[in-house]
Curated annotation (Swiss-Prot):
Binding-site list for ATP: L569, G570, K571, G572, N573, F574, G575, E576, V577, K591
Modification comment: Autophosphorylated.
Residues modified as Phosphoserine: S434
Notes on the domains: The coiled coil domains mediate homooligomerization and are required for location at microtubules.
Species for this entry: Canis lupus familiaris (Dog)
Residue ranges constituting the Protein kinase domain according to the UniProt record: 563-816
GO biological process: cell adhesion; chemotaxis; Fc-epsilon receptor signaling pathway
Every F-BAR domain range: 1-259
Annotated protein name in UniProt: Tyrosine-protein kinase Fer
Residue ranges, annotated region (Important for interaction with membranes containing phosphoinositides): 1-300
Coiled-coil segments on the chain, per record: 123-185, 301-390
Cellular localisation: Cytoplasm; Cytoplasm, Cytoskeleton; Cell membrane; Cell projection
InterPro entries: AH/BAR_dom_sf, F_BAR, FCH_dom, Fer_F-BAR, Fes/Fps/Fer_SH2, Kinase-like_dom_sf, Non-receptor_tyrosine_kinases, Prot_kinase_dom
Catalytic activity, EC: 2.7.10.2
Length: 823
């Protein structure tokens, strides 16, 4: 099998093969050039990344950190990888690409040479086998005619007996020419036969075999180029593998359990001798009736001691109950973390558990605080019980001898003194009954003192709510709340209403203490509790005093730990949307807000939750709650299993019956009629913003652009993204949104529904669609759309807003149409 034996008559195919191979080589050359450029850019990008790394992050502290060492080695090895990639790109350029360029030139020359030789031998073969023979045959026929003519004339001459010799001579001469030409023709024919045989048996096969040999040599060369390319560009070469091995080894050297051993050794301090807390005996120097470390039981304190003992007993029971609850919560959370750990597919998935682990540690701290409180109450109770039991059944001794002596006072003085002692006694009893009266508590102490509860558990802490929403909650003098800053996550702000203004104070964190401008505290609850109970001004300049803590709306507030994120469902305007599971195993949809979004977008994100809090309707997606205690903010919605309506229409277009399409339309009208009754303007009604729930119930969703206006009209100065083809003319031209503009969008939604998910105004750009609508054009009815439905669409698209129907009217019309449809 070969070119010479099998491709003698396949010249066109051979030429096409060469052309195709040349195009292929040019493509390979272009690809290699782009690969070189890409690798150089990649190497440069890696180097720039390493150069831009904050040098402070690689500077060692005065202790040995494996994390820092590992990070430094990662940077160094990344730089090494950059150098390797740059070298590879240069080798690729000087090696395979250069040789490929030479090979293309050689292949072009081979093609040119083959075509030239083939044309030459083919022309020679045609000349010998056709052209020359045709000439001889033509001359042959002519000489036969001349000989026959001479023969006839010779016969005539014989018959007449005139010029016989002359006629004979001409006859002989013509016969000789014919015979000579005949011999030439026979020889030429023999030569042509041999030439043709040589052409097909030797000459042409030799040329084709020569071409095949060069083709195969070039394939061999190309194979070598490919092999060199493969070796140079391989990402599993020893040097690259070593880079990643070094990185992996440095990562494996990180041991969380020993990471801080050296730090502890360097900064270890000797345990300071604890200060002895003893009774200050100097207090007794001017009084002989009181004894150090002794409970005084007498006629002035007996009653109050009983009250104190009872209060302590109650507080101890409450503390112990709270301790049990917290310990159970610790066990439950530990179990949840353990279960979640088993489902982690990647090592980095442990990050998803960090917030829960932090909550666990906070719970353990709460447990320890409760145990401390329990021990304190127990010791105090035992001290009181001992004193009360010692004197059980005895008459309390008097503190003062009221008998008159030589310097007795008058009866009036005695009454006044008795009155004063009674006042003192009742005052002492009152103080003991309500030792935390300054904090507004009627018990001896809270189970956990308010200031010791975590920030997230404080009623006045609202999490990462927007500034404008915080201001709406502050209405009276002294109203206050604490929130996390939207612009700077991790920074906390005190918002207060004072002297007709809403003031915002950043809570400073300096030297591990929280403060405004006065005393610092170890946590924010202690700081706020101090200013609230003492009525100390926040700053001297502002004169602001905290009077009324504004509690958060606990109905909607959830903690981040209350929901476990699952699979990614998609991406919204503000961040990712996940499937989530609540503690009670309820499946939900979790909308997240990117932490790096501008302040105004975060406000828009929470706007949806603020609106949905007020609504409860089967055709409106339901709000479960919000997680604003820390970043990132979550909005928890009901999980609607069917997904968005637009995708549903396109996916199920061959299955959906007409009656179901009308039902979807009726659901949408019902939901929008409810919103209309609440003066809510959706502003972005479209199939993509509706969801399909169980039993194919359609729900209106995506209230990110919605507004609730008492007048039913909202004017916008401009939106960054406007759904042009869905928006009413008055909204596009003047920024005037209303329920009537939502009705226009509803007409487009109907068109999407009955076209089974086709984009409105097909074939038109946004600008073309807008211009056509202004000229009076309206989209034609979708195929198989009922006439009654299209009439509704046309009503919705009336240019004048006041002429469009109300959603309540649309709901009634669609109800009637639904009853008529049977299929």
């Amino acid at each position: 099998m070969g070119f010479g034996s099998d491709l003698k008559n396949s010249h066109e195919a051979v030429l096409k093969l060469q052309d195709w191979e040349l195009r292929l080589l040019e493509t390979v050359k272009k690809f290699m050039a782009l690969r070189i450029k890409s690798d150089k850019e990649y190497a440069s990008t890696l180097q720039n990344l390493c150069n831009q790394v904050d040098k402070e992050s690689t500077v060692q502290m005065n202790y040995v950190s494996n994390v820092s060492k590992s990070w430094l080695l990662m940077i160094q090895q990344t730089e090494q990888l950059s150098r390797i990639m740059k070298t590879h790109a240069e080798d690729l350029n000087s090696g395979p690409l250069h040789r490929l360029t030479m090979m293309i030139k050689d292949k072009q020359q081979v093609k040119k040479s083959f075509i030239g030789v083939h044309q030459q031998i083919e022309a020679e073969m045609i000349k010998v086998t056709k052209t020359e023979l045709e000439k001889l045959k033509s001359s042959y026929r002519q000489l036969i005619k001349e000989m026959n003519s001479a023969k006839e004339k010779y016969k005539e001459a014989l018959a007449k007996g005139k010029e016989t010799e002359k006629a004979k001579e001409r006859y002989d001469k013509a016969t000789m020419k014919l015979h000579v030409l005949h011999n030439q023709y026979v020889l030429a024919l023999k030569g042509a036969q041999l030439h043709q045989n040589q052409y097909y048996d030797t000459t042409l096969p030799l040329l084709l075999d020569s071409l095949q040999k060069m083709q195969e040599e070039m394939i061999k060369a190309l194979k070598g180029i490919f092999d060199e390319y493969s070796q140079i560009t391989s990402l599993v070469t020893e040097e690259i593998v070593n880079v990643h091995k070094e990185i992996q080894m440095s990562v494996e050297q990180i041991d969380p359990s020993t990471e801080y051993n050296n730090f502890i050794d360097v900064h270890r301090t000797t345990a300071a001798k604890e200060q002895e807390i003893e009774f200050d005996t100097s207090l007794l120097e001017e009084n002989e009736n009181l004894q150090a470390n002794e409970i005084m039981w007498n006629n002035l304190t007996a009653e109050s001691l009983q009250v104190m003992l009872k209060t302590l007993a109650e507080e101890l029971i409450q503390t112990q109950q709270m301790l049990v609850n917290k310990e159970e919560a610790v066990l439950e959370l530990e179990k949840r973390i353990e279960e979640s750990s088993k489902t982690c597919e990647k090592k980095s998935d442990i990050v998803l558990l960090l917030s829960q682990k932090q909550t666990l540690e906070e719970l353990k701290q709460s447990v320890q605080q409760l145990r401390c409180t329990e021990a304190k109450f127990t010791a105090q109770k035992e001290l009181l019980e001992q004193k009360v039991q010692e004197n059980e059944g005895k008459e309390p001794p008097p503190v003062v001898n009221y008998e008159e002596d030589a310097r007795s006072v008058t009866s009036m003085e005695r009454k006044e003194r008795l009155s004063k002692f009674e006042s003192i006694r009742h005052s002492i009893a009152g103080i003991i009954r309500s030792p935390k009266s300054a904090l507004g508590s009627s018990t001896f102490s809270d189970t956990i003192p308010i200031s010791e509860k975590p920030l997230a558990e404080q009623d006045w802490y609202h999490g990462a709510i927007p500034r404008i929403e915080a201001q709406d909650l502050l209405k009276q003098q002294g109203d206050f709340l604490v929130r996390e800053s939207h612009g700077k996550p991790g920074e906390y702000v005190l918002s207060v209403y004072s002297d007709g203004q809403r003031r915002h104070f950043i809570i400073q964190f300096v030297d591990n203490l929280y403060r405004f401008e006065g005393t610092g505290f170890s946590n924010i609850p202690q700081l706020i509790d101090h200013h609230y109970t003492t009525k100390q001004v926040i700053t001297k300049k502002s004169g602001v005093v905290l009077l009324n803590p504004i509690p958060k709306d606990k109905k909607w507030v959830l903690n981040h730990e209350d929901v476990t994120l699952g699979e990614l469902l998609g991406k919204g305007n503000f961040g990712e949307v996940y499937k989530g599971i609540l503690k009670d195993k309820t499946a939900v949809a979790v909308k997240t807000c990117k932490e790096d979004l501008p302040q105004e977008l975060k406000i828009k994100f929470l706007q949806e939750a603020k609106i949905l809090k007020q609504y409860d309707h089967p055709n409106i997606v339901k709000l479960i709650g919000v997680c604003t205690q820390r970043q990132p903010i979550y909005i928890i919605m009901e999980l609607v299993p069917g997904g968005d309506f637009l995708s549903f229409l396109r996916k199920k277009k061959d299955e959906i019956k007409l009656k179901q399409l009308v039902k979807f339309s009726l659901d949408a009208a019902s939901g929008m009629s409810y919103l209309e009754s609440k003066n809510c303007i959706h502003r972005d009604l479209a199939a993509r913003n509706c969801l399909v729930g169980e039993n194919n119930v359609l729900k209106i969703s995506d209230f990110g652009m919605s507004r609730q206006e008492d007048g039913g009209v909202y004017s916008s100065s401009g939106l960054k993204q406007i759904p042009i083809k869905w928006t009413a003319p008055e909204a596009l031209n003047y920024g005037r949104y209303s329920s009537e503009s939502d009705v226009w969008s509803f007409g487009i939604l109907l068109w999407e529904t009955f076209s089974l998910g086709v984009c409105p105004y097909p074939g038109m750009t946004n600008q073309q669609a807008t211009e056509q609508v202004e000229r009076g054009y309206r989209i034609s009815a979708p195929q198989h759309c009922p006439e009654d439905i299209f009439k509704i669409m046309m009503k919705c698209w009336d240019y004048k807003p006041e002429n469009r129907p109300k959603f309540s009217e649309l709901q009634k019309e669609l109800t009637v149409i639904k009853k008529k449809v049977t299929q």
